[in-house]
Amino acid sequence: MKKLRTILFAITCTLVIALTTLLPVTATDDAFDLGKNLYSTNYIFLDADTGQVLSAKKQDEQISIASLTKMMTVLLAIENSSSLNQTVTITNEMIDGLYEEQASVAGYVNGDTATVLDLCYAAAIPSAADAANALAIQIGGSFENFYQMMNDKATQLGMDHTVFKSAHGLDREGQYSTVEDVSKLLRYALQNPTFKEIFSTKEHTTQATTYYPFGIPLVSTIWAYADTYGYDLANLSGGKTGYTLQAGRCIAYWATVNDMNIIAVTAGASTNVEQYSNLSDAQTALTSLASWHKKTILKKNDVVSTIEYKSFMHTANIDVKIDKDITLDLPADVECTYEVDLPKKFSAELYDQNIQATITFTADNKTIYTKTISITLPQEKNIFGRIILHLQNFIKG
């Protein structure tokens, strides 16, 4: 009896981190709405560490994302280059048509040479379309092959509402994404230290080119305009801006506020009121986030539920415990509660039972976070108990 009781109480509960989800909050006038004063029509704000969505609006609407596309281009270049110091020769194919479309360019001309790393900086910092095209042909061998690589990577990352048809993000028919998909891309890409370094750089100078014997000076589209127009983006660590007539002003960035590691993607901001409305939105959101804080809702080994487990000879109460702290980002003075969706009684079976349950966290009368946990209940060990279970199953057919 003592051995069986020991087995029962030794059951462990393991958090299934991959199944973490959050029901996003829509734009209403409440403490969780980070977008109520934004110009952007589409936005998502999430915790980079936990995936908790803090606030979102039209996050799954298919839209143009303009030069945010270049984050995928640079990521693929980093992941698929044998060496970032490899030299690329610029060809007419890489630059044809860009001036006619009034695309942002670094200024490379036919015959110039550049390293893959310099091209990554050029695509990321001043949003150079010529650099993005050069990376596409260098990495993919052709534009079409590279677009396929982009779409394959999007599928891998769960970007289910994204289709790429360019490396630079200029408007193309049938090309679209969502701010939620872009947040998935950025969250993944930030695990790559080279990507993180490039997109957090304010200035970079390339190797010498035909028209720039001392190298092309590259300046970030984020910090250059923030400094010029007085936007306070002190907490912003890095990111990428974008603009086309179809997309409006866009920005994807990461920031640290009150120990919260935030990822934000906003899109569709009009320039009718403010020229750099995407940067204005970043400032507004970061100011709002200053009143948010991390709060530990559950600590490791906290009991979230107790179940009654009945075997042939014994009945035992088993505590379901959390194996790690659960910390959420919350506005000031907002309390969070939780409920566990788990039956209170279980009976032993002929096999181990893997049980999943959902913990739902609620604040300000809305679901803000859900986490799935799993527990394993051992099979019936007693020989007479197993015989009875076999007979019951036989009778049931």
Question: Model features per residue range: what roles?
Answer:
Residues 3-4, 65, 112, 116, ...:
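Structural motif marking the loop-to-transmembrane transition
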Residues 25-180, 184-193:
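Active-site-adjacent loops and short helices of periplasmic peptidoglycan-processing enzymes
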Residues 3-27:
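Sec-dependent N-terminal signal peptides of Gram-positive bacterial secreted proteins and lipoproteins
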Residues 1-4, 56:
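Short, Lys/Arg-rich N-terminal segment immediately upstream of the first membrane anchor
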Residues 159-160, 174-176, 180-181, 186-397:
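Domain-terminus/edge residues, biased toward the C-terminal soluble/receptor-binding domains
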Residues 2, 16-19, 65, 69, ...:
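Residues at the start of alpha-helices and the adjacent loop-to-helix junctions
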